């Protein structure tokens, strides 16, 4: 099925690209989320009329993400206190939501879906560098310090 992308989509294309995708991917994900429209003559004309508006929206989202990345870079280490054993092993773990809540409490709005923990949840005390994906083109790093609770 041929679709016109209304947003930048990783590993697929940019705004305005006409791409061929499997019908299920288009029907179940791209079309319902408003990330694409079916490629036909009428939709092509409508898209070309709205192209400037969509590009401005994407540029605004990128600017907002860049601004948030600068705020994250300016943050000192975010500290999370958690119950831990004698050898620094946590009772439980620290996941995406805990990190997002701590960063938000520190003054920069962050959603749990933006936090990237490729090795899974944190299960020990120490210093960590957490990757944050704010936008398809904007990444940031947050310094996280996990300390034992008294």
From Swiss-Prot:
It comes from the Bacteria. GO terms for molecular function: rRNA binding; structural constituent of ribosome. One of its GO terms (biological process) is translation. Coiled coil: none annotated. Keywords: Ribonucleoprotein, Ribosomal protein, RNA-binding, rRNA-binding. GO terms for cellular component: ribonucleoprotein complex; ribosome. Binds to the 23S rRNA. Belongs to the bacterial ribosomal protein bL9 family. This is Large ribosomal subunit protein bL9. The gene is rplI.
């Amino acid at each position: 099925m041929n679709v016109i992308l209304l947003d930048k989509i990783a590993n697929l294309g940019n705004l305005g690209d006409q791409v061929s995708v499997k019908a299920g991917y288009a029907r179940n994900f791209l079309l319902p989320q408003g990330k694409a429209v079916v490629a036909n003559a009428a939709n092509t004309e409508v898209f070309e009329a709205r192209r400037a508006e969509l590009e401005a929206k994407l540029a605004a989202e990128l600017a907002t993400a860049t601004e948030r990345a600068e705020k994250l870079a300016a943050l000192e280490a975010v500290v999370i206190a958690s119950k831990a054993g004698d050898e620094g092993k946590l009772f439980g773990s620290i996941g995406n939501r805990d990190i997002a809540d701590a960063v938000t409490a520190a003054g920069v709005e962050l959603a749990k879906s933006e936090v990237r923990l490729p090795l899974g949840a944190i299960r020990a005390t120490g210093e960590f560098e957490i990757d944050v994906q704010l936008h398809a083109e904007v990444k940031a790093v947050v310094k996280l310090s996990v300390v034992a609770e008294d």
